[in-house]
A protein has these predicted regions:
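Family-specific signature for flavin-dependent thymidylate synthase
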Residues: 1-210
């Protein structure tokens, strides 16, 4: 059994300038004001759009991510149906080939609970391998014993309006800590690369707290 960490990676990231230009040109098309495009005008108009709730224009900017998370977190994230998802399938992936499963340690375990959790993970791994190796059942049946904290890779394609919505919901103190930690890393990444689109959210949630 391998313990892995949550992670967020941006796939084929567009430049900041490309996103700025796309959104500004779309917004200015509504008023035929393309002649007002200057150096620095894009950030100004995008900030105006966001501050005044005109979010449809930022839907023209989209991003693709590769994330590693536990299955329970993936179930929460895929509720955001304005995204496109490609999720590692436990029906077709055969973890017996590597001889072990990958898991993510849940947030909030104390020492005693960690020992119980670790023992349970080993039991689940053993049962899964036995069902495939000895009982000769297909992976779609053996997966029934896999844990919720099984590490899974998820590709996510999302426009920036929906991404902002996800960040606000999943960084709220009422969200489960496991998804908050993952989405905090996501916020740090996108704010660092595309600041004007996320500066208001970063101002509120830029530092994670329990």
């Amino acid at each position: 059994m391998i313990r892995v960490k949550k992670s967020v990676e941006l796939i084929n990231p567009p430049s900041y300038g490309e996103l700025l230009s796309t959104v500004e040109r779309a917004a200015r098309n509504c008023y035929q004001s393309e002649n007002k495009i200057t150096d620095g005008s894009a950030e100004k108009i995008i900030r105006f759009l966001i501050n005044n709730g005109h979010f449809s224009m930022i839907e023209f900017a989209d991003l693709t991510f590769k994330m590693v998370m536990d299955r329970a977190t993936a179930m929460q994230l895929t509720r955001h149906r304005l995204c496109t998802f490609a999720i590692e399938s436990t029906r077709y992936c055969n973890y017996n080939k590597s001889g072990e499963i990958k898991v993510i340690v849940p947030e909030g375990l104390n020492d005693s609970a960690y020992d119980t959790w670790y023992t349970s993970m080993l039991m689940a791994e053993t049962a899964y391998m036995k069902m495939i190796q000895e009982d000769k059942v297909p992976t779609e049946v053996a997966r029934s014993v896999l844990p919720q904290c099984l590490a899974t890779t998820v590709f996510i394609h999302v426009n920036i309006r929906e991404l902002r919505h996800i960040l606000k919901l999943r960084l709220d103190k009422h969200a489960q800590k496991d998804i908050r930690v993952l989405v905090q890393e996501l916020l740090e990444l996108v704010y660092g690369m595309y600041p004007v689109f996320f500066e208001d959210i970063y101002e509120e949630y830029g530092e994670y707290s329990d």
